[in-house]
Amino acid sequence: MRIWSPISSTASLVVAATTASTSSTPLGSASPAPKWNTLSGKTTRLIGHRGEKAFMPEHSLGSYWQAALEGADYIEPDLGLTKDGHLIVNHNEYLGGTTNIAHIPELAHLKSNKTWVYDVDGREKTVYNEWFVADLTLEQIRMLRINQASEYTWRPQHFNGYFGILTFEEYLQVVRNVTIELGRPFGVIPELKSPTLYNRGRPYDRYFEDRAILTLEHYGWANITRWINRDQHIDLRLSAKLRPLGAAVLGPSVWQSFDMDSARYLAQHTDVPVVALVEQLPWAFTPAGLDRLAGFAKILSTWKDIFVAGPEAYLRHYNITWDEKDIEQMGGFIAPKDLVREAHSRGIELSPYTFYDSRQDMAYICQDDNAESKSEFCPKSKAEELFYFFDMGVDYMFVENIVEASTLRLQYDNQLAQAA
């Protein structure tokens, strides 16, 4: 099987992405599109992880446009909340690693330490000597410029300092604009980062969630289904004039959260499906755990190695403990080959993360020579990796270098069509 090389030419990216997002059935052909093993029977949908971070600084205007041009089905933002209550787009709760904040003397005094309950594992987490989103006003955030992560030497660095941090509202305007300009819908899939941190010191416990809900509703991607205290958000100044869609149609919307209480709240208060992000919660990978998740989540998203090493081997490798009796009572850990089937039988779709640029290590336990356990399958190339998950029938994938993933998806689709 051919291993696909990364494509660096912008023109080639656009052409390849356009081709890869087109149905494999020839125009005018009576042959139906091949049926995939996904819950819907349609192709696995590709989520641009933080936009297109393989080529642009993550979560930047350029990253989101690049993801759209490359044919992503969804474009992902991560949300944080500033000191003065503005929703902004940034992956970490802090700003030192991906911005130029260390070089702005006026903000030096805001460097601090912070402890909060981390939503990934439910444990206290402390970050030292950082600038936290929650401690800066939007005016101060506007002083920053985004940089590409320098440790990934193959990623272009020439866009460093070019883009500023976007607000959630600006992100939604970008997606609305690319929908109109490119004539196709793009899904929005915001992740609410660390709700326990961002709700600290706010007027009430779900202030962060409600702020996001009201913004998504304003832009036409959500309907509110339960009462929300709008009086606490009268300062939320959203754009009064939206660009007309014309013939364009907005894509779908989906919430994401590692915090199960926050995820449940989002599901209860909007008609927007929720992704339960789960990585270090052992109970979630049991039959009874999936039953519990099905009560509020339409999609389960977890680290991809859960589907290769299996839940038990993965959790043991990272020293995550559990009560053996509790897991046994919940039906035991589900084998990796059965995870998709068990989830689909409950109406839950699957969205593993993260599928990297082929120049980056895939980060599976089985590729570690010192690992105690080895998997039945261990990918040796990007093609082998993606085809394994396509065969399984995962419904979504968080991907970087979207063109690579789109091209391989098209190749797989063509093979299905030929085998039909």
What is each stretch, according to the model?
Residues 2-6, 13-420:
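Phosphate-group recognition and catalysis centered on beta-loop-alpha active-site segments
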